[in-house]
Amino acid sequence: MASYFDEHDCEPLDRERDPRTNMLLELARSLFNRMDFEDLGLVVDWDHHLPPPAAKTAVENLPRTVIRGSQAELKCPVCLLEFEEEETAIEMPCHHLFHSNCILPWLSKTNSCPLCRHELPTDDDTYEEHKRDKARKQQQKHRLENLHGAMYT
């Protein structure tokens, strides 16, 4: 019976000469063992990087509010200028109001409200998956704390 290498007309890899072999082997083993990509350092650590810009559709769909009456006393949190009556402001989902010239450049760089950090959706699938994973882990932690608390009450 012929060996695998004779059958396929190839030579065995020299692991000492090609360091990629060990790296690829480790990756294959970790995938086989269902190891997290985070453990391998192959995932961006979003907790230590700026989030991506807000999705264009999310920004386009933000409500525009016409400033009326007592709202004219409010100030834009970015430029600190008071809103003028009948001026149009952009309202974030968290209900903070901004001049469009102030908030649009901000949202082109990051996806959150500059005051409270309420996040808008992004067009970055990796970041959105990170947010879902983080929420799942937080829910799991909360359930475990509740379970632990229920055991000792």
Swiss-Prot record:
GO molecular-function term, one example from the UniProt record: zinc ion binding
Catalytic reactions on record: S-ubiquitinyl-[E2 ubiquitin-conjugating enzyme]-L-cysteine + [acceptor protein]-L-lysine = [E2 ubiquitin-conjugating enzyme]-L-cysteine + N(6)-ubiquitinyl-[acceptor protein]-L-lysine
Recorded metabolic or biological pathway in which this protein acts: Protein modification; protein ubiquitination
GO (cellular component) term, any one: cytoplasm
EC number(s) from the headed UniProt entry: 2.3.2.27
Modified residues (Phosphothreonine): 153
Assigned keywords, A-Z: Metal-binding, Phosphoprotein, Transferase, Ubl conjugation, Ubl conjugation pathway, Zinc, Zinc-finger
Entry-linked PROSITE patterns: ZF_RING_2 (PS50089)
Region (Disordered): 125-153
Glycoprotein in keyword set: no
Post-translational modification: Auto-ubiquitinated as part of the enzymatic reaction.
Record's function text: E3 ubiquitin-protein ligase which accepts ubiquitin from an E2 ubiquitin-conjugating enzyme in the form of a thioester and then directly transfers the ubiquitin to targeted substrates. Catalyzes monoubiquitination of 26S proteasome subunit PSMC2/RPT1.
Family under the similarity heading: Belongs to the RNF181 family.
Protein name listed in UniProt: E3 ubiquitin-protein ligase RNF181
Organism: Bos taurus
